[in-house]
Regions:
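Internal glycine-rich alpha/beta core junctions
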Residues: 139-141, 145
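Short hydrophobic alpha-helical runs that function as membrane-insertion/retention elements
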Residues: 78-82, 136-138, 202
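Acidic-aromatic/histidine active-site loop/patch
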Residues: 129
Length: 275
């Protein structure tokens, strides 16, 4: 038979941060008892209970994280997560038709892919699995197949690809302050006010100009670009810089998992492909 439980009933204990609670511990005894009786156990994801008995929700990625946490508590062989794709691909198969399904990938590489724009798994679930050494397998809900195994060990096939995958993020905007005085700590004076406003700064590039000044460029989420640009205009004026410039027609492309055995020239091949 089957038995269903809420997060509170199996005591998925969380902190008190409602809507974004973090899992502290899980009491697996109730689940173990049902499994020993031969029952299938169904546990509601995305929810837990705090020390005072209040129901909490785990926030973004909470359901995947619940599955990983249960697998860790039960010391399962692996945690299988079913999605709308066959597994983890070298890049988004909805954009690139000949993207290849990866048989295996390391936690580190999966974290990089997830943080750089790949949507197949939430970063939080991968971090949890890596911390507790729970092998993850991403499978399709609709098709048969072995999917992709995410683990600590790198698959050591002789014909390993040079890189694990390519991630891209369209939700980007580029901001530049030109003609910034070349003095120690100037990058912080440019970027600090943007970060202080709660805007996440991503890629940062600093270039030296011929006249002894610097150009400082960084990226933010496109939705935050207008607010960041207004802050940057004030910063440029206060620092005596030339001007602040905004560009919302950019995309971030990242090569992930450049292997130790990789042939030389990968960066040049990437630049050539984009030329």
């Amino acid at each position: 038979g089957a038995r269903s439980f809420t997060g509170g009933q199996v005591r998925i204990l969380t902190d008190e941060s409602h809507t974004k609670a973090r899992i502290k511990e899980i009491d697996g005894s109730r689940i173990h008892a049902q499994l020993e009786q031969g029952n299938v156990v169904v546990v509601a994801g995305f929810q837990g209970v705090d020390e005072h008995g209040n129901i909490t929700t785990l926030g973004r990625g909470g359901s995947d994280t619940t599955g990983v946490a249960l697998a860790a508590a039960l010391e399962a062989d692996e945690c299988q997560i079913y999605t709308d794709v066959k597994g983890v691909y070298t890049t988004d198969p909805r954009v690139v038709e000949d993207a290849r399904l990866l048989k295996s990938i390391t936690f580190e590489e999966m974290l990089e892919l997830a943080s750089l724009g790949a949507k197949v798994l939430q970063i939080r679930a991968v971090e949890f699995a890596g911390k507790y050494k729970v092998p993850l397998r991403v499978l399709s809900t609709f098709e048969e197949g072995e999917g992709t195994l995410i683990s600590l060990e790198e698959d050591s096939e002789m014909e390993d690809p040079a890189i694990a995958g390519i991630a891209f993020e369209r939700d980007e905007a580029k901001l530049t302050v030109t003609g910034v005085p070349d003095v120690p700590g100037i990058a912080y004076k440019v970027i600090g006010p943007v970060s202080d406003a709660g805007i996440e700064v991503d890629v940062i590039v600093q270039n030296a100009a011929e006249d002894g000044t610097n150009d400082i460029t960084f990226t933010v989420k496109r939705a935050e670009s207008e607010r960041a640009f207004k802050i940057l205009q004030d910063v440029a004026t206060s620092l005596g810089a030339k001007e602040a410039v905004q560009d919302t027609k950019v995309c971030k492309v990242s090569l992930v998992g450049v292997r130790k055995r990789s042939p030389e020239g990968i960066p040049s091949k990437m630049v050539k492909a984009l030329a």
